[in-house]
Amino acid sequence: MRQKLRGIIPNLATSIGTSAEANAPGALALGGSSEASKKFSIAEGYLASSDGYGAIAIGSAAKIKQLEKGTINHIVGNDNKGLYVDADGNVTKITVRTESEKDILSRYGQTYGAVALGFRSSSHNLFASSFGAFSTATAIESLAVGDSSQSTGYRSATFGSHSRALAEESLALGYETRANAYGSVALGAESVANEENTVSVGSDTLKRKIVNVADGTEDL
């Protein structure tokens, strides 16, 4: 077990475990080969890695990191501009929706406030959160909950094992659901939503009925 304390009390960096590394003020690495490399970041678990300001990675091989260098990612916004990460791992082009997002990115970096919880879970963007084994959240303010779930659209959310929210502000609820279009909602196991701003309760091959719906309050 190894513990490293650096600087004055408010800026302690602490690492506990074989080859654990805490390399920034306020960082905490707990577990064998864990690494917390940004201010106030936390990495807990074997091979856990947290590379975002104030980011939290908990679980064996859980990971918070910027997207790989040299990759182009078309997941931020529906204008397909996406972001580009240069050879040094720096974001050189990114589509953001608010001035506050732009300010946070410039001040603290791409993975500020990200959270990954679960075996090999990973989050790769501003306020992205993933919960569950192999879950992944890659877009700004995206949320993935459930094993092998994936949220790649700006402000998208997915809940359920193997569910996918792939478009901006899309929502997938249920096992193996797919929300593939802007503002779409896929509701119920294996439902697929392929059209913008629509709610799907099934797919081309899976049909469902919506029952027990009350009358509306106004006549048209």
Task: Specify the residue positions occupied by each region the protein language model found.
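Small/polar residue-rich beta-strand/coil "junction" motifs that cap repeat-based extracellular fibers
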Residues: 1-19, 23-134, 138-220
